[in-house]
């Protein structure tokens, strides 16, 4: 089964917790802190595997959670970094953040990789908090939470040339006669329901990959029929071969077909109109084809070059292939996405940390709820089993301006304050 779009959940591993420990060595009084740092959590890394052709595997496994880092140990020993979780994807996979719509990666070549969810850093052990005024601190951090997000995977086939047109205009037949591909061919619409790829040899030491894309109908750009499912595969092609049925057996006007398909391409993605398009008048072996072709030429004008062919008899096919090969030699790759720079993704939730660091709301029972990436991250990294860590967290809240903001919202001694699922009393 061909699957070209799927939604999955990914989570980087949490960092390991730092440790509170002290040196216990004979004849060394007050040996000092010796708690090690936690190890970094594993990243979730997507890697291109050229043998894969579909996203089918992701229908059965939709959650990918990387391992956390090892906790810090005594004697100043740091925890081990967790091994990255490798997720293999087929060439042509685009990874998109489901919440923001941001393109995280466009994975094309074998072995290409991208970090999709970063692991959290390890928490610091108590040796990191030693100061002249506090030489033996009882403070250690929990590991930083790993990045988590829902992502959309879209597979856009890798082909140099895309065959487009209405259903049953002869796209699959054309692909079958110019390559070794064997797409399903039958006398009914939408026989082709998945893209078929074939390698075309022109006979003069040139070759290219051609994709037979399922037929389009009016409204495809808005999802009519299987519109979006098909149109996304055209985006990677460099040359579009527009196949038109000149026989008239379907009862449609060839010129109206031509206008409709071009409009669908334009409405779906305006950049598709930048690609060179070769217009193919197919089924020229049929009785009324020549008459229909002349009428078509009068309507499109002399600017549009038309290649009359018969995919069944192979009439005109050789000239068509040479024209396509010539166009490919002068047509560059078209970038289909603006992929986020590495600098944009190297800091977790960078967009959320810019601007307001926290938000305060009040529930119907009077409870103050504090939310925001910075405060929630600080909360998760605090070890509340140790008094010094609790006092440090209180100082951090004051430093962020949360105490002052709560007073401004009317908070008084004894009022309940909630962060995530935890509640505590406000002390003024």
UniProtKB/Swiss-Prot annotation:
It comes from Bacillus cereus (strain ATCC 10987 / NRS 248). PANTHER family: DEVELOPMENTALLY REGULATED GTP-BINDING PROTEIN-RELATED, MITOCHONDRIAL RIBOSOME-ASSOCIATED GTPASE 2. This is GTPase Obg. Pfam families: DUF1967 (PF09269), GTP1_OBG (PF01018), MMR_HSR1 (PF01926). It is found in: Cytoplasm. Mg(2+) binds at residues 172, 192. Disulfide bonds: none annotated. An essential GTPase which binds GTP, GDP and possibly (p)ppGpp with moderate affinity, with high nucleotide exchange rates and a fairly low GTP hydrolysis rate. Plays a role in control of the cell cycle, stress response, ribosome biogenesis and in those bacteria that undergo differentiation, in morphogenesis control. Residues 1-158 form the Obg domain.
